[in-house]
């Protein structure tokens, strides 16, 4: 199954803000890179995020709103980015950039960039 860039961006946004992951968009060689969640291949990523319980508990349950949430498509038709700021229950806010790479209608890489210490503080983690 292959997806358009717009579909992959939409699926990725849904996963980020709701925890609902569409595993069909992930290429066999998919890689996820994140300061908190570490680097994961497809199998490890699915193990962590297909069931959203831990992601919701550690992250989403603390977020009160996303504002702004901006999506951009690369001119090359292979890359996209999401720039977002979220606010948490303890009054903190975090800026995050999410970079995606698409090949042959499948997501091959997702890289999340943010200040790890600010993120831990925002979520009340040590």
Q: Which sequence ranges carry the predicted segments?
A:
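C-terminal and inter-domain tail/linker signature
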Residues: 1-126
């Amino acid at each position: 199954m292959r997806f358009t860039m717009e579909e992959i961006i939409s699926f990725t946004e849904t996963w980020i803000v709701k925890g609902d992951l569409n595993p069909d968009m992930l290429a066999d060689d998919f890689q996820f890179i994140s300061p908190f969640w570490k680097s994961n291949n497809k199998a490890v990523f699915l193990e962590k995020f297909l069931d959203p319980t831990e992601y919701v508990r550690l992250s989403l349950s603390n977020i009160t709103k996303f504002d702004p949430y901006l999506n951009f498509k690369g001119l090359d038709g292979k890359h996209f980015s999401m720039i977002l700021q979220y606010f948490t229950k303890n009054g903190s806010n975090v800026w995050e950039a999410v970079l995606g790479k698409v090949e042959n209608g499948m997501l091959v890489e997702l890289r999340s960039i943010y200040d790890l210490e600010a993120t831990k503080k925002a979520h009340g983690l040590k």
